[in-house]
Amino acid sequence: MSLTSAAGIISLLDEPMPDLKVFALKKLDNIVDEFWPEISESIEKIEMLHEDRSFPENKLAGMVASKVFYHLGSFEDALTYALGAGDLFDVNARNEYTETIIAKCIDFYIAQRVEFIENPKEASVVDERLEGIVNRMIQRCLDDNQFRQALGIALETRRMDTFKDAIMKSDDVRGMLAYAYNVTMSLIQNRGFRNEVLRCLVSLYRDLGVPDYVNMCQCLIFLEDPFAVAEMLDNLTRSSVETNNLMAYQIAFDLYESATQEFLGNVLQHLKNTAPIPTALPSTFKPQGTTSEDGAKSEGDKSKSDEDITEETPADDKVERTIDSLNEVEKLHQKNIEKLISILSGEVSIDLQLQFLIRSNHADLQVLRGTKEAVRVSICHTATVIANAFMHSGTTSDQFLRDNLDWLARATNWAKLTATASLGVIHRGHEKDSLALMQSYLPKEAGPSSGYSEGGALYALGLIHANHGANIIDYLLQQLKDAQNENVRHGGCLGLGLAGMGTHRQDLYEQLKFNLYQDDAVTGEAAGIAMGMVMLGSKNAQAIEDMVSYAQETQHEKILRGLAVGISLTMFSRLEEADPLVTSLSSDKDPVLRRSGMYTIAMAYNGTGSNKAIRKLLHVAVSDVNDDVRRAAVTAIGFILFRSPEQCPSVVSLLAESYNPHVRYGAAMALGIACAGTGLREAIALLEPMVKFDPVNFVRQGALIASAMILIQHTDQSCPKSTFFRQLYAEVISNKHEDVMAKYGAILAQGIIDAGGRNATLSLQSRTGHTNLQAVVGMLAFTQYWYWFPLAHTLSLAFTPTCVIGLNSDLKMPKMEYKSAAKPSLYAYPAPLEEKKSEEREKVATAVLSIAARQKRRENADKKEDEKMDVDEDSKEGAAVKKDEEAKADEKMVTDEKPKKKDEKEKKKEEDKEKEAAGTSSEKDKDKEKDKKEKKEPEPTSEILQNPARVLRQQLKVLSVIDGQSYEPLKDVTIGGIIVFQHTGKAEDQELVEPVAAFGPMNDEEKEPEPPEPFEYIED
């Protein structure tokens, strides 16, 4: 018989005999889930029994009390009594009570552990009973093979002992290491603890049977430990095993893609010292000091600078030796170090990507021609120049500009600077000939000048050498010192900032600061941005103080705007270290400095997905009184979320419907930045109504640009709205009634969506998951086009070629093939535009009214008759015949303006009739032919790609190396980028890909006739 009340059992708790109380507690423990309301009225008695240490089953009393409090919803008390129950609390029990208490226990333990580690002096010691339950829980996970759960608890509770156990005890150690690395980089916000975990991962990678050098290197980049990286590379290059040498090259390529200039410089310096003959190494990169020779110096200057270098090198035994005196092992080591230096200095990567972009250029000039014909306003002229630069970014093809020199010459004043700087985007990465390319625009010693072209040329040099400026910095620095004109100084500052990005060089900073202190608005704006670029992520207290104090003093809004960006760049990726600066900037009375606070949050927490940062930005987005600050706050959300783009639409969806147009614009840009290149449908769904229906034109401008960022390199198969948006851009541009602002956005969008000859994507993180430093900086500077159009060019820093480039041991591209296991159309280039529209317009323009034509003919005929004095009858008849013919011709004109076409149609109809009459046999033949075509038409399910291959980001997952080739990759090809292959066949079997010349494959060159055959000229 089932119980209807617990009153009888509860009454036993008042009995004096302990055995009866124990009996009562055991019964209550069994029925507590059903009768907890009744038991709760006597909870005090149970609590007293628990606290009575002489009572034999005081732990059981704690267990009952814990369950009662759990049902009452008082989880903290429930946890306290569960801890008091000791071993009676079974962590392995599978019920709601146990799971809830364990969850609360872990949360409580995490809070105590974190507080104890971060504030050991103030925090109380962690409760041992809590730790006991957590330990049992971890052990349960390990016993049940729930290694990921154990690893998660270990990271949350900061237990490095458990972290190691969870990885090493698992069945798949490499898989667990990869999972641990991803979790560490995406979820751990605290910089100090993240570094501790990464150090642990490095030791685990090193202890594997075959050390995982690639991932070790990724961890060491985050740890900012260049010497450990250099040591690893040195060990690999000393090895006589070819695989180890090739692995060193692969690591060097990954390093160049992921690390800062300063980090690479330190690795290079350390590597040079380990070489058998350091002085024999090429000096392509010298960090923190004077840079190597640039193209502007003469041969004599070069030899002098080489002598200086050798003088600076300490005179030791290595200097006296020559290459010939080395043994075979040392020669190999020297050669390997030379190759590493060429890779780490960026020469090889930049040259290979340039080759790929030139070779694969599929930019559609017809798009630009259509835009050029449609625009009539100077702003749109500038936009078209910028769009052309984006479209040909890195391809070195300036075909469109050469074809339209008269049109280009319309650019005046600052538009001329923008146009000249666009050459820097087109020739991005074409570093060897950069000075020769820009020679005709660069400042010259003699002759007066407006300075717009010269400033643009210096800015262009910065764009060509962005984040890789060792060979051009000295030239730019000298030009900036010599500049007499504010326009030249403006371009010089921007160029120097881009080339010296992240070098933290004091001499560059001082020169830029000197230009800032001239109190010239135009120069000061560029200097402010450039100072931040040079001191990128340095958290240099002196630099921040200089910039903030000058920002508070200056009266020039332009200078303030430049400094707002510059200040934020100094805190790049500094996480919580930037909080004090953010707090002071956010509370400033000047709205431009408050805006700087928003940019600082964006830069400090870029890519972290930090909830704290997003909360702060959302608060400002809805509360600040200044529209610019609100717009910046919403835009900044995009920078925080670019590693988890799928979260961005839900965060900004309400802001996208705000009454404030600046907030709507910010929401559009945030979507563009966070979801760049993803083709995310949720993001496009938010942008589409903005583009079509928003009443404010600058919101439409932002939405158009953002849509192109998201749809870059997407086809209708991967994102159904792709063609719709391409057509929309063309419609907005050609519509005479559209506002200039919307047109500007549409023109830029056309350039962005086809960037890099349709071979580049927008990406704020590298393939290996690191923040793409120059891309984030370029994107932030691009958002400033709102105030200053020339800054739009910096978006080119975020364009990443989507290629897989295979290299052999000589760092050359061998002829080899990859297989893409997907239909070719899924990742194909968009179809080129046809030139139909312009032809139709010409025909319509030449239409003549038939009545007018007939009237003219009659008048002419009458005049001729009047002029003739004597007329024969024969001639009269002839004239009558002619008149009849003319009348017939007139009638013909009435019916159709294009008689030739009509004749052709009629002929076709007649032919069709003849064919129909030919009988059923021909029809049967036709049907057979159709069937054959239909059978041939099914698209192949895969395609073969030649090295170097254009492989889209979403295509990488279906990419593989074709079997049967004599090349084996040193890392997974699905990561993409530059991959070193080991050649397993004979050395003489290798066929190499022929390099192509820069300036791109010109259309004119293709049409040129062949030269005549050789012949002898004999005089008579």
From Swiss-Prot:
Belongs to the proteasome subunit S1 family. Residues 294-307, 858-867, 876-939 have a biased composition (Basic and acidic residues). GO terms for biological process: proteasome-mediated ubiquitin-dependent protein catabolic process; regulation of protein catabolic process. It comes from the Eukaryota. The modification Phosphoserine is found at S298, S303, S305. Acts as a regulatory subunit of the 26S proteasome which is involved in the ATP-dependent degradation of ubiquitinated proteins. Residues 1003-1020 have a biased composition (Acidic residues). InterPro entries: 26S_Psome_Rpn2, ARM-like, ARM-type_fold, Proteasome/cyclosome_rpt, PSMD1_RPN2_N, RPN2_C. It holds the Pfam family HEAT_2. The modification Phosphothreonine is found at T291, T310. PC repeats lie at residues 418-452, 456-489, 491-525, 526-560, 562-595, 596-631, 632-664, 666-701, 702-742, 745-777. Residues 279-322, 855-950, 999-1020 are annotated as: Disordered. Residues 281-293 have a biased composition (Polar residues). GO terms for cellular component: cytosol; nucleoplasm; nucleus; proteasome complex; proteasome regulatory particle; proteasome regulatory particle, base subcomplex; proteasome storage granule. This is 26S proteasome non-ATPase regulatory subunit 1. Keywords: Phosphoprotein, Proteasome, Repeat. It comes from Drosophila melanogaster (Fruit fly). GO terms for molecular function: enzyme regulator activity; zinc ion binding.
